[in-house]
């Protein structure tokens, strides 16, 4: 929802040469009222006063320029024109906000998640791992076939799958150990830095104490 200050600015037609502000300037000029002085007073009343207080406040401002028989009608005209312009502007603002939200939702719906780009280095590393798995499994298969050809044929699929899973698990475990090692090393470094700061602090304090004692001894000698 648009803020009150934004609505008021739109009602006045700031920046576009139109709106209530231009109409009020023309009306005040026709009534012989100094718009440069009283425009701000009138707008302040319209923007800040309660609805039932607007007429009384406007009559107090314009009574010095207008006859009593026309004063109330002109004040009503100003209040009604303000209300009409404000209502239209508020409606347009709401429609603009709804359109903006609709457009945003449509754009979000059109967003397509881009697939992760696999680098050439990753491709080569993956191919090397697959080739390594293939070589090891082929050697194991040959040994199994020599020992028990029937059992080898029956279990070949599960053995390969198990080997792959085991190797993947080994890789993951190795990475975890590496992360843990780095974290432990970082913690040790922090503790060492903390101890070093404490040592530096104590050494500084000791130097101050020694300097203080030397100063005191010098004063006693004098």
Curated annotation (Swiss-Prot):
There is a cross-link at residue 93 (Glycyl lysine isopeptide (Lys-Gly) (interchain with G-Cter in SUMO1)). Residues 136-145 have a biased composition (Acidic residues). Residues 210-222 have a biased composition (Basic residues). The keyword Phosphoprotein applies. Residues 135-222 are annotated as: Disordered. Keywords: Coiled coil, Isopeptide bond, Phosphoprotein, Ubl conjugation. The modification Phosphothreonine is found at residue 137. Residues 119-148, 175-217 form a coiled coil. Residues 152-168 have a biased composition (Polar residues). Residues 172-209 have a biased composition (Basic and acidic residues). Belongs to the CCDC43 family. This is Coiled-coil domain-containing protein 43. It comes from Rattus norvegicus (Rat). The gene is Ccdc43.
């Amino acid at each position: 929802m648009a803020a009150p200050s934004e609505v008021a600015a739109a009602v006045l037609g700031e920046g576009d040469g139109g709106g209530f502000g231009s109409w009020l300037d023309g009306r005040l000029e026709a009534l012989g009222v100094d718009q440069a002085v009283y425009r701000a007073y009138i707008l302040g009343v319209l923007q800040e006063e309660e609805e039932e207080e607007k007429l009384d406040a406007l009559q107090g401002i314009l009574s010095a320029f207008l006859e009593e028989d026309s004063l109330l009608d002109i004040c009503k005209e100003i209040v009604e024109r303000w209300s009409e312009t404000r209502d239209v502007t508020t409606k347009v603002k709401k429609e603009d906000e709804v359109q903006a939200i609709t457009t945003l939702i449509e754009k979000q719906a059109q967003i397509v998640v881009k697939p992760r780009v696999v680098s050439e280095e990753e491709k080569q590393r993956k191919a090397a791992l697959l080739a390594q798995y293939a070589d090891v499994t082929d050697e194991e298969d040959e040994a199994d076939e020599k020992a028990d050809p029937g059992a080898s044929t029956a279990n070949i699929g599960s053995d390969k799958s198990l080997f792959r899973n085991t190797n993947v698990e080994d890789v993951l475990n190795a990475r975890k150990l590496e992360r843990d090692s780095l974290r432990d090393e970082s913690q040790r470094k922090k503790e060492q830095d903390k101890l070093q700061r404490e040592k530096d602090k104590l050494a500084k304090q000791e130097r101050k104490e020694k300097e203080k004692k030397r100063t005191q001894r010098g004063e006693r000698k004098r």
